[in-house]
Amino acid sequence: MTLRAAAVSLSALCLVAACTTIDDLPEERVGAATLRTASGLPAGTAQLLRNGDTISVAIAAVGLTPGEHGFHLHTTGNCTAPDFTSAGGHLNPGNRTHGSLSPGGKHLGDLPNLVVGANRTASTQVDLTGSATDILADIFDADGTAIVIHAGPDDYASDPAGDAGARVACGVVEAA
């Protein structure tokens, strides 16, 4: 290969590399939770996914009543039945008020309502707000984190929990 051909090839490679952004990188699974009801029945799975500096929660739920259900990240990785109160309150490292409709905006544990269809299933993926490093440190702290699904919809305003009712499913987030 001549020097000129090598220079052209190297230039082309650099142009292609310059067009690749962090957003083009594939998602990496960094955590997961198996959701269960108070009676121990499977209620779905949740995954924490990383794409560059974005962390998202992907959830697939089964066996829930049709309609909207609040779901949140909770402060403690413990899902003791029957009421799952062992999971603590919402994950709120910045000590903000609850709900996307609150004047201060939502906290880390606030997620949009999960919409369950007539077939009793739901799935969604939600991006979390903040840097990936900070989010992962908060989720994988010493006492862990749980994902909780509630019986009713979150009203996005009532502090501290959104008035979403009883906790009907819970899963402890484990690092992948």
Residue ranges and their predicted role:
Residues 1-17:
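Sec-dependent bacterial lipoprotein signal peptides
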